[in-house]
Amino acid sequence: DVFFYQADDQHFIPRSLLIDLEPRVINGIQNSEYRNLYNHENIFVAEHGGGAGNNWASGYHQGEQFVDDIMDMVDREADGSDSLEGFVLCHSIAGGTGSGMGSYLLETLNDRYSKKLVQTYSVFPNQVETSDVVVQPYNSLLTLKRLTLNADCVVVLDNTALNRIAVERLHLSNPTFAQTNSLVSTVMSASTTTLRYPGYMNNDLVGLLASLIPTPRCHFLMTGYTPLTVERQVNMIRKTTVLDVMRRLLQTKNIMVSSYARTKEASQAKYISILNIIQGEVDPTQVHESLQRIRERKLVNFIDWAPASIQVALSRKSPYVQTTHRVSGLMLANHTSIRHLFSKCLGQYEKLRKKQAFLDNYRKFPMFADNDLSEFDESREIIESLVDEYKACESPDYIKWGMEDPGEANVVAALDSKLVV
């Protein structure tokens, strides 16, 4: 009952809200086989149905307009929870609704529920192909500021890497949205198994995230999953062992973020923390032996200023989902190479900003009225500082980083008392 509650007729209803500024996607859900799954009172579609036009400022402004209606739904669900621990937001950072309205919701949740955790699953745009959204760099930068300041944990879902995995690992020449989304849903499902099938450890959101995020701002996680299959491969059977799964999780080709790259600079990056969630029939002694082998072979490069250990959580498999493999694994990792993804976003932003391109689209809205573009400048500074901090994490002297004033240590520790323990 973590993610569901029972209605009077005993069927289960998700504790979820579906929010959009245009009706196409939600109408698709309401006309599908899932139409009776969701609580219809928890579905919000803007009356005008015009969307945000792929404009962050439009989405943010409409978030201000509709915040009372949306927060009424949030408050109702929160009041119906026995022990509310936090919120999970699924959104994209490139368009208008997910980025703009998502940003406003992040700020509002952080303000109204300041003691609760906010975790996001954030879809980053494809960095290789030309985007249909010409203002994508502006939208991404403005959203990244909110993800840095208002979220406690961000699971990065990188479209560039997801497409690469679909092509290279699943051998799909032209992956569909449904096939890419199945990768995302696999990650989301696996990352919540310890909450849905609680054991002795990692059975709540704080316990899951506290060890992964030792410092408040470095809370962007990358994921890896193995073995990956698509529908047509369901009948393919192979032998899976704990060591095989844990070793594969560390391979670059299985990481779902493109910044975990094949460049020389990225290869010098380090792990801040790793949590492997292993599902299936597993003997704890196998886990211990696998960790020992990984340590002996020096397969992992950890930072110098924190414990260098891979944490492992064992979880049961769902009895309702049939799989052909005995053992599967998800890696949640805090890795300094994530900064290269942010640097790409900054680089794309700088190209557009130098040309002053498409800024009139933003000046139409209150935040950017009277040619006030300070929001862009502030967002850029925050993301540059985030990139610098991830770079500093690779140094043994990171603990002293940015602490010119002795009192600053206390300020940093107080930034996020929800996670820093």
Curated annotation (Swiss-Prot):
Cellular location(s): Cytoplasm, Cytoskeleton, Microtubule organizing center
Supply the CDD domains for this chain: gamma_tubulin
Cellular component (GO) terms are:
cytoplasm; gamma-tubulin ring complex; microtubule; nucleus; spindle
Keywords linked to the UniProt accession:
Cytoplasm, Cytoskeleton, GTP-binding, Microtubule, Nucleotide-binding
Question: Per UniProt, where does GTP bind?
Answer: A94, G95, G96, T97, G98, S99, G100
Please name the GO terms that the record assigns under molecular function: GTP binding; microtubule nucleator activity
Question: Which GO terms are recorded in the biological process aspect for this UniProt protein?
Answer: cytoplasmic microtubule organization; meiotic spindle organization; microtubule nucleation; mitotic cell cycle; mitotic sister chromatid segregation; mitotic spindle organization
Q: Does the keyword Mitochondrion apply?
A: no
| UniProt function note | Tubulin is the major constituent of microtubules. The gamma chain is found at microtubule organizing centers (MTOC) such as the spindle poles, suggesting that it is involved in the minus-end nucleation of microtubule assembly.
Q: Which family does it belong to?
A: Belongs to the tubulin family.
Query: By what name is this protein known?
Result: Tubulin gamma-3 chain
Q: Which organism is it from?
A: Zea mays
